């Protein structure tokens, strides 16, 4: 939830989930 896309340097899997 704290991640929105890989640009934030979050976990790729989590980033993808929140980005989509």
Curated annotation (Swiss-Prot):
Q: According to the record, how does the cofactor bind?
A: Binds 1 Ca(2+) ion.
| Single GO molecular function | toxin activity
Q: Which UniProt keywords apply?
A: Disulfide bond, Hydrolase, Neurotoxin, Presynaptic neurotoxin, Secreted, Toxin
Tissues expressing this chain: Expressed by the venom gland.
Q: What class of enzyme is it?
A: hydrolase
Its annotated compartments are: Secreted
- EC number(s)? 3.1.1.4
- Reaction catalysed by this chain? a 1,2-diacyl-sn-glycero-3-phosphocholine + H2O = a 1-acyl-sn-glycero-3-phosphocholine + a fatty acid + H(+)
| Keyword hit for Secreted | yes
Quote the PTM field: Contains 7 disulfide bonds.
Cofactor(s) this protein requires:
Ca(2+)
Gene Ontology cellular-component terms for this entry are: extracellular region
Family, as annotated: Belongs to the phospholipase A2 family. Group II subfamily. D49 sub-subfamily.
What function is annotated for this protein? Heterodimer: presynaptic neurotoxin. Monomer: Snake venom phospholipase A2 (PLA2) is inactive towards micellar phosphatidylcholine but is weakly active towards non-micellar dithiolecithin. PLA2 catalyzes the calcium-dependent hydrolysis of the 2-acyl groups in 3-sn-phosphoglycerides.
Subunit note = Heterodimer of an acidic subunit (CbIalpha or CbIbeta) and a basic subunit (CbII). The acidic subunit (CbI) is non-toxic, and increases the toxicity of the basic subunit (CbII).
The protein's name is: Acidic phospholipase A2 CbIbeta
Q: Organism source for this protein? A: Pseudocerastes fieldi (Field's horned viper)
